[in-house]
């Protein structure tokens, strides 16, 4: 079992994709720095985020995927659900390796799951926009308490 350890950022994930292709060895598990390792593993690789590698992977994805699919990837990342990083890693790997676009291949479980997570986040975004009510505080500022299920506030 190969484990990649990275900083749990989107840029770190794209760097992990680049490093996996350059090493020709793909991880079975992605962990954040400081997370405990599984009981049995063969190799642990520490990934250092590199902007040049991130740019190369992102430009490669721009050539293979539509702007909407790239948006789906970033919104899925913003959900911050557990195992989203490994799901996106597999999705990006399939997007790079496939001869045609995988965006609408809902027979693939990873594509379907990315689509489901994207739908959950965008539906929550719409609910926040529709039902958020502001109250005026004593000092005249407006305040609204929000407790999102998915961390999609950046996307609003």
Predicted regions located by residue number:
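Short glycine-centered, acidic/aromatic-flanked micro-motifs in structured strand/loop junctions
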Residues: 5-6, 146-148
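Conserved small/polar residues in nucleotide/adenosyl-binding loops
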Residues: 154-156
